[in-house]
Amino acid sequence: KKKLKKINTIDLCFIDGNHQEKSTIFYFNECLKYTNNNTIFIFDDIYWSKGMENAWQYIKSNKKTTLTIDLFYLGIVFIKSELSKENYKIRF
């Protein structure tokens, strides 16, 4: 949190490691404060557990989230206000 305060905006944010619903949502919400209209989030292990699936659903439904791509092992989120809200799922 302290390091985020030193950053004006986040262009790319990779979130990995904790695998807990509450923590993942917390990290997303904290980083969301520093986004711009071209920010991309990447979340690892979105199906690691039921909690991570819940966190992924929360992230997809956030009003600032405009486009998501579910690659099963990871999720990509675009924050771009002029895009239509879309959720894609690609398995490969």
PLM feature spans:
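Structural motif
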Residues: 12-14, 42
